[in-house]
Amino acid sequence: FGENEYVQTIFMKKNDSLATAFDVPQGITAMVGGGGKTTLMLRLAQELVQRGARVIVTTTTHIFPPEGIPTGNPTNAEEVAHALLIEPLLCLGKPLKDGKLGAPDLTMTALSCLADYVLVEADGAKHLPLKAPYEYEPVIPEETQLVIAVAGLDGAGQPIQDVAFRSGLYAALCGKKETELVTASDIALVLAHEAGQRKDVPQGARFAVLLNKADDTARKTTAQEVAAELNNDSVERVVIASLGGKS
C-alpha cells in the first residue's frame, strides 16, 4: 500500500451486516473509544448467533448487564461449555456493587477456546461520543485479533469539554483548548493516534473504525471528511453507521 492510500470506507444501510462490514474473525474482538461500543457489541453478537455461532460478550472494564442475555461468572470452563450448548449467547462478568459487571474470572484466552467469538468492551467513555485514553486505558486482551475504535459523530462541532471523556487529554492530542470545537480533523487525528484510539493495540491485530450516529446529511458529510483524513497504514477500514441505542 502507498503511504497516502485512502482507507476502505463502508456506508451501512439499515439491514446491512456489521459482522460482514468489519469482517469479524473468530476469536477475540475488542471495542474501544466512545459513542456506541455496547450497541455495536450486542449487534455483532446477535448477527453472529444468527449465523449459528457460539458467542460470549464480556468486558475488561465494566458494563451494565445487557437485557435478555443470560449472565454469569463461571469459574470453570466446563460450566461455560455446558451453558453454550443451551444458550449460544452468554454475557460473562463479575458482579460489582454498582450493578455493573467487571472482568470475568476466566481469562479471555480460556473464553476464546470455548466460544467461536468473544466480543469485549475494553474501554469506558461515560456515554460521551468521543474519548481519549488515560495511561491505564484501554484494557485490550493481548490475543485480540480485531480492535474496533468507535467515535460518535454527534461530537463534531461541539466544545471538546462537552463531548469528550478525558477532555483534557483529547484537547492535548488535538493541540487545542478544551473550550474549542471538535472538527473532523480532530476526530481523525485521535482515532489514528498511538496515544489515542490506537493505544495498546496488540501487535498483529487488525484495527478498524466505526463512525457512529451518522443520522443526517451533515453527519454523513463529517464522516466522509474523517474517513478522508485516515489512511490505510494505520486503519484497515472505516464503517459509517447509525446504530442508535445507548453508548
Where on the chain are the PLM-derived regions?
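Structural motif
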Residues: 33, 60, 94-96, 212-215, ...
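Loop/turn-to-beta-strand initiation segments
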Residues: 87-89, 114-118, 146
